Amino acid sequence: MKINGSYKLPADPETVWSVLLDPDALAKSIPGAKSFAPEGDDAYTVDLSVSVATIRGDYSGRVVVADQQPRSSFKLIVEGKGAKGALSGSALFTLSQVKPGETVVSVEGEGEIAGLFARVGQRMLGGVAKLLMKQFFGNMKKQVQASVKAAAAD
């Protein structure tokens, strides 16, 4: 399944970069995340709950940030397993300043889901992936706005 999209965030690339890679901001932004903990450099363990149609699944997995080009791009690699299947994927996040105080984050990647979710919700998975990305960046926008506000108060 292809994963792609572009999302505007209200800050310069340096601020967006630091918030996107901040463990606390990630924990607050990942839809369905129940826990998100560092596991060494640029790696995290995550427990999350995902719903597709009427099926809900809990997954435990790992998130790795790789191929970092500071304030420009990075790759996010995700793996998870649960009682109802497994999920994996990777995506390249590219940051571009479109005007002062505004950064576009473009996401290009692929994901796979195996097990019950894949069998029951195959037709819906693309839509679900887009919805989850929209939720993630909506949550991340709030984290970026809080960071900008905190910096202005200093």
Question: What function would you assign to each model-found segment?
Answer:
Residues 16, 20, 26, 65, ...:
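Hydrophobic pocket/interface hotspot
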Residues 79-127:
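Beta-strand/loop substructures that line and gate deep hydrophobic ligand-binding cavities in soluble
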Residues 116-154:
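A conserved amphipathic terminal alpha-helix motif
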Residues 5, 34, 61-67, 78, ...:
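Hydrophobic/aromatic beta-strand elements that line small-molecule binding cavities or substrate pockets
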Residues 1-51, 146, 153-154:
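Hydrophobic ligand-binding cavity/cleft-lining segments
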Residues 12, 41, 70-71, 98-101:
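Short strand-connecting beta-turns/loops that link adjacent beta-strands
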Residues 2-8, 43-45, 58-60, 73, ...:
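Intrinsic-disorder/low-complexity, polar/charged segments enriched in Ser/Thr/Lys/Arg/Asp/Glu/Gln
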Residues 37-79, 135:
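Glycine-rich portal/gate segments that line the openings of hydrophobic small-molecule binding cavities
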